[in-house]
Amino acid sequence: MRMARVQLVIAITGATGTVGKALLSTLIEAGEPVRALVRDPRRLGPYRVRVQLAFSDLGDPHALRHALRGADTVIHLAATIRDQPPRRVEEVNGLGTLRLLRAAERTGVERFVFFSAIGATRFQRTRFFRSKALAEEGVRSSPLRTTIFAPSIVYDRDDPWVTIMRRLALLPVLPISGSGKALYQPIWARDVARCVLASLEGEGDSRYELAGPEVLSYEQMGRLIAAASGRNRPIVHVPLPLVRSGLIWLRRVFGETVFATWEEAELLEIPMLTSRGTADANALGVDPRPMGEVL
């Protein structure tokens, strides 16, 4: 059953990320009024003149309450894989979500849309997945109408990870960290955005696992990106201990501007699969495209 939704403001965190950029474009095209919660509006690019702006920080409850006034829906995309000194992953992903949730409850927001991840549990070995699981538990316990999306790996043609892989393909060989055998069901950011838009017409209190139509390993995704760039390269697997040592050293040298961290590399050893395949996306009227076709 679908219900008509009075058109009020949709507040978005993480609007400058891979999903956020695709979602901004999709919502604007659909004529939805959008408010982006940002620290630096310049990172929105041309979208900054097409949306409302609210300066806020997940560490500031007062600023969050001010930013959410007049909004009926919050879409919470902001998250981090690496520490953001002085804040750690757990504070940004876990406590930050709870602060935003409480602000939404106090300012009259009706619906809270949260992005978790396939495979997020308290018992995962990575801090990112554990923090996402704890945040999801908090969202589930809220009195608001909630919608939870748990996607597999989300990509876009020019997202940071695809860009790094494309640059690595300039080398004579394509380096892949670890075994490269972890499996994913990659889904295009634009398809994810279409799922979110469709879900806004529902009653809420739903959870969707979003996946693309293919099961691909990390190595296979790397090959697809290289091939789409016109560069078919032989694969070289870099042992994880060497990857870890190298990335830790780079972070010490370059600080938080380093292009990748061990936490990010470690995630590419953890499968993100759902037995539901594309069923949840299909239920929202979206037929996800294969990765090779998008690239």
Where are these regions (language model features)?
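Mid/C-terminal beta-alpha module of Rossmann-like enzyme folds, strongest
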Residues: 2-4, 199-262, 271-295
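N-terminal Rossmann NAD(P)H-binding glycine-rich loop of SDR-like oxidoreductase domains
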Residues: 4-32
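SDR active-site strand-loop-helix element
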Residues: 13, 37, 74-78, 112-118, ...
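NAD(P)H-binding glycine-rich loop region in Rossmannoid oxidoreductase-like domains
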Residues: 42-99, 103-106, 118-122
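Conserved catalytic-site region of short-chain dehydrogenase/reductase
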Residues: 83, 118-130, 154-159
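Short alpha-helix in the Rossmann-fold core of NAD(P)-dependent oxidoreductases
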Residues: 90-94, 113, 132
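Substrate-positioning beta->alpha
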Residues: 99, 160-161, 178-200, 206-209
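Conserved beta-loop-beta element that borders a ligand/cofactor-binding pocket
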Residues: 116, 137-160, 167-170
